[in-house]
Amino acid sequence: MISLPIDTVLPALRQALENRDEAVLEAPPGAGKTTRVPLALLDAPWLAGQTIVMLEPRRLAARAAAERLASELGEKVGETVGYRIRLDSKVGPQTRIEVVTEGILTRRLQADPGLEGVGLLIFDEFHVLPFSPKNPEILSNLRTFSCQN
């Protein structure tokens, strides 16, 4: 596996999430946020076998992210990593990482506000999501990790 800039902060991120419920990870495009973070956290003890749900703003990005994550594991989409987008879904009984779009997450929250069985919710590309805060002070109490290229 090729080394990416994000790799240097992953241990600190794992440690922080053992002690806190939230964190913000900032890194430039191509640093490895989408492809490395879910895989690095998959075996975290605090997840206790629960699912990681990663929100992507677009269907194409959700599918591509799932394909890349599955490829990194040497698997096909629908095994450990799957996706749910409008009119298409590839998940299975062993799926532990689900890449979803906003509409899918919204419907899931309406049906299950507590997100039963979900141990981690990742907002990828947070700045382009329609509900992202326009005021950065809203996120000021979150632990932020920065990665430089």
Regions found by a protein language model. Give the residues of each.
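N-terminal pre-P-loop "Q-motif" helix
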Residues: 2-19
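Conserved P-loop/Walker A NTP-binding site and adjacent catalytic elements of P-loop NTPases
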Residues: 15-16, 21-140
